[in-house]
């Protein structure tokens, strides 16, 4: 397999989370994610690429969302906007079961 294809496959397998640095909802969601990873090691297997939409606007513009935080698996939108702790946990559980 070519290096480019391997890199593309890696990117696909990573969850992406679009944020804004000063967004209180993004900060809360990130704190919950860290809390989940501390509580249950299975969640540590979920790789999340954090993308600040102001810093990486050219990447952010390739995805269909308006509100942050926004979570994607590949091009599939998993969540957009104000999150709840249980909502994020449900997304993670579905993601781990490949049920998305």
Which residues are covered by each model-predicted region?
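Structural micro-motif
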Residues: 62-73
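Local sequence-structure signature of Cys/Sec-based thiol-disulfide redox active-site neighborhoods
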Residues: 2-39
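Residues at alpha-helix caps and immediate loop-helix transition turns in enzyme cores, especially N-
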Residues: 28-29, 64, 84
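Secondary-structure boundary motif
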Residues: 38-42, 97
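Short alpha-helical
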Residues: 24-25, 55, 86
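Thiol-based oxidoreductase modules, predominantly thioredoxin-like and allied folds used
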Residues: 43-57
């Amino acid at each position: 397999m070519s290096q480019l294809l391997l890199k593309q496959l890696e990117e696909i397998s990573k969850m992406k989370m679009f944020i804004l640095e000063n967004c209180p909802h993004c900060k809360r969601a990130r704190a919950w994610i860290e809390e989940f990873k501390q509580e249950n090691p299975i969640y540590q297997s979920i790789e999340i690429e954090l993308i600040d939409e102001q810093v990486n606007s050219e990447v952010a513009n390739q995805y269909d969302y308006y509100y942050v935080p926004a979570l994607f698996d590949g091009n599939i939108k998993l969540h957009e906007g104000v999150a709840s702790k249980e909502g994020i946990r449900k997304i993670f559980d579905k993601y781990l079961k490949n049920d998305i």
